[in-house]
Amino acid sequence: LSGDLKAVFKDRGDDSQYHPAELFYFLGQKKVSIPLKIKTRGNFRKSASNCKYPPLMLNFPNSEVMDNTLFSGQNKMKLVTPCQGDEYTVNEYLVYKLYNLFSPQSFQGQLLKISFQDTLKRKKARTYYGLLLENENQMAQRNQALLFEKIGYQPTQLDKVKFLEMAVFE
């Protein structure tokens, strides 16, 4: 992931903005490049006092540049970045996989190695484990469900078993 990452990682307010970036990956020997926009997201991990690298929202372009890429058909995806180090990121990935065994109404995650390269610095890229999460709309569609934006549901308003399954993993 390449761009003015210093500006991105400093933009941690409630109203963080999208910044231009470029995502590179290798498909065999071929280097694939996708221009995109990224911004910080989250709550606890978004704070600089808690995490050096805040979680990111990846906003992919809706264009032919996405055709025949690993991210074809994607719009926005959440990227969990290393907060407490690689071990915690790998453990979080395993928790997602465990939750997937309990319920299909859970997010699919993909563990990956991610390198951060700030285009304004001449430092070597740093590589960490990251976790890419499926889009909310994809999870809802996969489960023939609808998304609701309401915040503050009471446990008594929800399916008891599903709520308790979720609570174990929250």
Language-model features: locations:
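Phosphate/dinucleotide-binding and metal-coordinating scaffold of catalytic cores
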Residues: 1-170
